[in-house]
Amino acid sequence: MNVLLLGNGFDIYHHLPTNYHNFLNVANFLHDHYNEGKEFIGDVFSDKRLQDKDPYIAKCYKEHQKVYDTVILSPAKAKEIIDLCRDNLWFTYFTQSFNKELGWIDFEKEIAFVLEVFNKFLLNVTVIPSMPNGEADACYILKHFGFFMKTTTDGFMGVPTTKIKEKYIIEYPKGSKNLEVNKDLIISTLSSMLDDVAKALKLYLDCFVNITIPRIAKEPYAKKCQAIANIDHTVSFNYTNTYEKMYSSNKIYHLHGDVDRKIIIGVNPDTSDSIETIDTSFVSFKKYYQRTFFETDHEYFKWVNDINETKEDFCLTAMGHSLDITDKDIIIELFDHAREIYVLYHNEEAKKSYIANLIKIFGKQRFDDLRRNKNLTFYSLNMDFTNFADHLRSNSDEVYMMQYGDEKSFAESYWNE
């Protein structure tokens, strides 16, 4: 059996604008220029003002111009993206945090940083705060999200202070005249705003990316990776349906949801999730909570349970996934079950990063064991994959024969179902 692990690099390999910063740039562009008349996706992607801000979109447009210039942009969805992002403080925070020099933004790390600031603040506040502007980053975040305001008078020793807005103050218990910060309202407001960003991202991927993939797949120039031609199960961290529409409709598990359902934007477990110190105040922001609530990993766990029962092993191929420690629970599970492991990389820097990340997850000893016992091997995407594909095909044929035997047995089982 052959299993494929996918990350966003898979979409990038196919020149699709699925990075978070592509979404930010397009959403901001729609806000500023949509009324100029943008009938087709190509009218947006070809605009020099957008391309100057986002050179990768220019690259995608050059690759897929024929398709983009003929796919109609949904006015209703474009307007909804604009409405969801307008005045959304998470969206403006992400936009301001975008590193123009590096050309990327890590939503998860930014969310984790913001939540850490609010968690520290709310854990330590039992009365109405009057906070000196000491920690610049923390103060900026607390004020940016609209819960605080500067006072008109100076605080201690002439230092300006920041106070919470009355909207977020409650009397507790009722009638006691004891005023407290309404922690639940602050957390639910943060969660609601982030949910709107997730909705906007889903709409962007739906009407700018997903809708184009079937058309791109039919084009003779469409780029396809020979190494993943014989896959039985796919575990994807992507929101798009690129693999299904360009390669195979075999069983695929979208752990973070996809454009046809809810999508997950959140952070990983931390010390607040340990049983000794568990704090569920911010649990709705955690990916494991969202995967459970929206049931995006339900089918995946059923499949893993089946593997545990049958003791069936598999060849695992990873493509476009950073193998970062943020997804270590899934990575460890798949790597532990795999008989052989192949990691595809697009350049030497990526290979270095993959090796370093796996060492972080497994440690040196277990990393060496993976190389020694599970044939952990790294392959460049620029190589000839003919022999590699033949190897995977033989694994897939083994599964076929285990399930159905010879062709006659397969035909009988098929018609009897």
PLM regions: where:
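Extended, H/D-rich, highly charged conserved domains that either
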Residues: 40-295
